[in-house]
């Protein structure tokens, strides 16, 4: 990337805003200043910071920055009759909107489902709104971990960089949702979830669950890497 701290999806927006800034200053200082502020806001929205990711294939980590709006036992979206725990993370317009792989493994499914653009903070948005559903078979335990990138009122563009057959590392970048959104992670039944409603999560860093049920003292404080 030319600008490592900005996601490439933001380049067109920033470029247009910058051109308008130059034109604006040609007419008046005030107009140029307005467009300059818009340029800075675009750069802030599409920021793409590195994260310090735990090196542990047994973990499920948060795929996004945001607030946990619900932790609920629901039916698996890919296996009828099988119950899983859904962790829903709401991203406000101020959060980093780059999404990260919550688990290490192999991508088994990527599907786009059209829908509405209702507020992403509601549970109904999961089934009604436009979304991209991905399934990663975990390196540890061969669990099918489902991730849903859900559109919202302002989030009209979901970008998922995953492709079936890809091997992904824990915390690696997997896409972005533009302008406010929601991400759901489905944790296998029997795996304790380590976050609750109201928790603020950091994408690529906050641990949601440990797939190794024999580890009772939490995940080991072993090694981390910048991703």
Curated annotation (Swiss-Prot):
Primary location: membrane
Cofactor(s) needed for function: pyruvate
Alphabetical list of InterPro entries matching this protein: PS_Dcarbxylase, PSD-A
Record-annotated active site: 181
Site (Cleavage (non-hydrolytic)): 180-181
Highest rank taxon of the organism: Bacteria
EC class: lyase
UniProt PTM: Is synthesized initially as an inactive proenzyme. Formation of the active enzyme involves a self-maturation process in which the active site pyruvoyl group is generated from an internal serine residue via an autocatalytic post-translational modification. Two non-identical subunits are generated from the proenzyme in this reaction, and the pyruvate is formed at the N-terminus of the alpha chain, which is derived from the carboxyl end of the proenzyme.
Residues where Pyruvic acid (Ser) is found: 181
EC number: 4.1.1.65
Compartment list: Cell membrane
NCBIfam families reported for this sequence: PRK05305.1-2, PRK05305.2-4, PRK05305.2-5
PANTHER family recorded: ARCHAETIDYLSERINE DECARBOXYLASE PROENZYME-RELATED (PTHR35809:SF1)
Family: Belongs to the phosphatidylserine decarboxylase family. PSD-A subfamily.
Function: Catalyzes the formation of phosphatidylethanolamine (PtdEtn) from phosphatidylserine (PtdSer).
Protein name: Phosphatidylserine decarboxylase proenzyme
Organism: Anaplasma phagocytophilum (strain HZ)
């Amino acid at each position: 990337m030319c600008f490592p701290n900005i996601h490439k999806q933001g380049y067109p927006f920033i470029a247009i805003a910058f051109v308008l800034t130059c034109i604006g200053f040609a007419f008046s200082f005030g107009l140029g200043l307005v467009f300059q502020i818009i340029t800075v806001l675009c750069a802030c929205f599409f920021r793409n910071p590195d994260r310090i990711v735990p090196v542990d294939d047994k973990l499920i980590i948060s795929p996004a920055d945001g607030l946990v709006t619900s932790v609920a036992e629901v039916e698996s979206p890919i296996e009828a009759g099988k119950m899983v725990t859904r962790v829903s993370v709401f991203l406000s317009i101020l959060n980093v909107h780059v999404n990260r792989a919550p688990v290490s493994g192999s991508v088994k499914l990527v599907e786009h489902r059209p829908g509405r653009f209702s507020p992403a903070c509601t549970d109904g948005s999961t089934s009604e709104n436009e979304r991209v559903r991905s399934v990663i078979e975990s390196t540890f335990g061969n669990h099918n971990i489902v991730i849903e990138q859900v559109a919202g009122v302002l989030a009209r563009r979901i970008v998922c960089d995953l492709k079936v057959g890809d091997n992904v590392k824990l915390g690696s970048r997997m896409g972005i949702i533009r302008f406010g959104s929601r991400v759901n992670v489905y944790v296998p039944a029997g795996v304790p979830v380590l976050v609750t409603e109201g928790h603020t999560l950091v994408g690529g860093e906050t641990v949601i669950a440990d797939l190794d049920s024999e580890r009772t003292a939490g995940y080991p404080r072993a090694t981390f890497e910048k991703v």
